[in-house]
Amino acid sequence: LIFPIKATSDNVDFDRQNLWIIDEKLAYHKYLASEIKLSNLEGISIPSNDRPDLVIFNHPFAFVEGEAPYASVVIVEFKRPMRKGYNEDENPINQVFGYISKIQEGNTTDKDGRLIPISKNIPFYAYIVCDITPKIKEFAKFYGFTVTPDQMGYFNFNTNLNTYTEIISFDKLVSDAKKRNNVLFEKLHLPVTR
């Protein structure tokens, strides 16, 4: 639904991805990989066998001479709908923070073996899409997450990792996507679904 599994932005046409459902800014990126080991990413070398559901490297928005470092990095982790149990190894917050730590370690190289400057100043964004179960609530509380005003998710900023993280329920994901589209449909005077 969002992006094909075990694919990259190099081999998936724009019309076969629905990244806008999570955040419309994700449609504009430099490189995206889905369910591919960090060590196997094309043009980038990160010594790790971890496989984020989605890892997205964004273009810088400022114009610079030569090849620019990444403006931001986005990690998306999906958990199966209606999943009940999680043990500590399956804690999605630990998972995304682990991916981010590996990327920030400074061992990331381009396809020619040159180090890619991923400084501590580059912002990271993490989206965890899952049902909000009692265990997810426990993980969120432990990490100091704040409940969203609609009670359908959590958010947090981790200063040590320079990472903004959202835990989004599947219901909230669908609800927010509908709301974003309804505004456009209303402006175009098209039928609106509620």
Which residue ranges define each predicted feature?
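Charged, terminal alpha-helix-loop-beta segments
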Residues: 1-194
